[in-house]
Curated annotation (Swiss-Prot):
InterPro entries hit by this protein: RE_BsaWI (IPR041551)
Nuclease as UniProt keyword: yes
Pfam families documented for this protein: RE_BsaWI
Protein's UniProt name: Type II restriction enzyme AgeI
EC number(s) reported in the record: 3.1.21.4
Top EC group: hydrolase
Superkingdom of source: Bacteria
An example Gene Ontology biological process: DNA restriction-modification system
Length: 278
């Protein structure tokens, strides 16, 4: 479908949403709008739940476009009682963590693997269980990965910590700040995964709104691609922007960027975790 956008001052532009019909867009809007200002519902949960729903309604659409062009613009239009742009900045990162957990845990449970989104004090507790709290800043991991019958510091259910996820809606979120923590985690034999929606577009009048991301290509890599392919600063990177170019079969570091939908089935991310934690 074609989504028309009004930027004010007479500046109007449009963006094409592949594999999204007008009926599907309306279905997503009808679900999300009542959640945006729902009392006692955290914005991170509203956005996370709506993203999972949107990817179910439009399984062949680009997940990053659904986030960037559909949910973000609905939220900015509908949010009241606060600056909507600042509210989105504050909460959207945690919303992505919520969505990762909600989407993948039903699939990973079959393999004895569990994800837990970490908020506030939970981050420090997770790093303590990993044995790296004294060397890693308390905000440098977003989602904990656990394996039943393995890992460090098993809980009462037998789930031990085997790694963590650095979740980034956009790679403009100073991903380089996570690299020291990631290297420490990997040095301890823990997985340190970068998961991203790789959101990046440029608005008019100079941009065309196409959400191309920031990872470049294997032949023309950006600095951020080199964090993974060149320097091996993360165990792996998973992008949910279908315009992201995946890594070639061989990279200088042996680490790879994978590109995936968000359908809730076995995919590159689940296959990777199962293989690594077998």
């Amino acid at each position: 479908m074609r989504l028309d956008l009004d930027f004010g001052r007479g500046l109007v532009a449009h963006v094409m949403l592949d594999n999204v019909s007008e009926e599907q867009y309306q279905q997503i809007s009808d679900y999300f709008v009542p959640l945006v200002n729902k009392p006692k519902l955290k914005s991170r949960d509203a956005i996370g739940q709506a993203f999972v729903m949107a990817t179910e309604v439009c399984p062949d659409a680009n997940p990053s476009d659904l986030w960037h062009h559909v949910l973000y613009r609905i939220y900015i239009r509908e949010k009241i009682g606060t600056d909507p742009s600042q509210s989105w900045v504050r909460t959207s990162g945690e919303a992505f963590e919520v969505a990762l957990v909600e989407r993948y845990n039903p699939v990973l449970a079959r393999h004895g693997i569990r994800l837990t989104a970490l908020f506030k004090g939970q981050k420090g507790l997770a790093l303590t269980r990993m044995g790296v709290a004294d060397r890693v800043g308390s905000r440098k991991v977003d989602v904990m990965i656990e394996k039943q019958g393995g890992g460090r510091s098993p809980d009462a259910e037998g789930f031990g910590v085997v790694g963590g996820i650095h979740a980034k809606v956009s790679l403009a979120e100073r991903v380089s700040d996570d690299i020291p923590a990631s290297r420490i985690m990997m040095g301890e034999g823990l997985l340190s995964v970068l998961s991203t929606l790789d959101v990046k577009s440029f608005p008019p009048p100079h941009g065309d709104l196409v959400n191309r991301g920031e990872l470049g290509t294997p032949d023309r890599p950006s600095d951020k691609r080199n964090y993974i392919e060149g320097h091996g600063d993360f165990s792996a990177c998973f992008s949910y922007n279908l315009r992201t170019s995946p890594s070639n079969a061989t990279t200088p570091s042996g680490r790879h960027i994978y590109v995936s939908g968000f359908s809730g089935q076995d995919d590159e991310f689940t296959d990777y975790l199962v293989a690594q934690l077998a």
